[in-house]
């Protein structure tokens, strides 16, 4: 199944916020709980602002493996300012090229969905929202839908 790069770029642009700071973190968590519903216990969630960890949630049905995936997905978003699913789409036909072309290790980076940039309309990418525990596209969609939800509260 081909992943649509243009759709993902569109999602990243659509999810831009007017503002996001420490006061907004709780609102994002509430959105994640509301949208994730019964899946909230199945996921780990990491929120970063300027590469600083400002929130972490480990669902009751998660393990340390989810923490490892969170770290790898976060590294992709931090390095490329795009969602980890976008990077997966670029290298879908040859994932090894991602690691070779960028001199990166599979130990520290993973091109699977679930890492999503937090961006502002005025300044660009200022953080990341990382989800791990569902399928990679479900992780991506949960992050995207939660950002769209708090965006709707800002307008």
From Swiss-Prot:
Task: Extract the signal peptide range.
Answer: none
**Database matches in InterPro entries:** PduO/GlcC-like, PduO/GlcC-like_sf, YBR137W-like
Q: Which domain of life is it from?
A: Bacteria
Q: Which SUPFAM superfamilies does the protein's record reference?
A: GlcG-like
What stretch or stretches form a coiled coil here? none
Task: Read off the HAMAP family from this record.
Answer: UPF0303 (MF_00761)
**NCBIfam families recorded for this chain?**
PRK02487.1-5
The family classification in the record reads: Belongs to the UPF0303 family.
Protein's UniProt name: UPF0303 protein lp_3613
Q: Which organism is it from?
A: Lactiplantibacillus plantarum (strain ATCC BAA-793 / NCIMB 8826 / WCFS1)
């Amino acid at each position: 199944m081909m992943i649509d790069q243009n759709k993902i770029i569109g999602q990243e642009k659509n999810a831009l916020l007017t503002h996001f700071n420490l006061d907004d973190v709780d609102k994002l968590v509430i959105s994640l709980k509301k949208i994730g519903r019964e899946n909230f216990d199945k996921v780990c969630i990491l929120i970063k602002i300027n590469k600083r960890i400002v929130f972490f949630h480990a669902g009751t049905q998660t393990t340390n493996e989810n923490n490892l995936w969170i770290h790898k997905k976060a590294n992709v978003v931090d390095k490329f300012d795009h969602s980890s699913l976008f990077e997966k789409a670029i290298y879908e036909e040859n994932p090894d090229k991602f690691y070779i072309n960028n001199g990166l290790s599979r130990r520290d980076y993973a091109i699977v969905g679930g890492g999503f940039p937090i961006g502002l309309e005025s300044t660009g990418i200022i953080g990341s929202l990382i989800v791990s525990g569902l399928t990679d596209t479900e992780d991506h969609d949960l992050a995207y839908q939660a950002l769209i939800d708090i965006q709707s509260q800002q307008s």
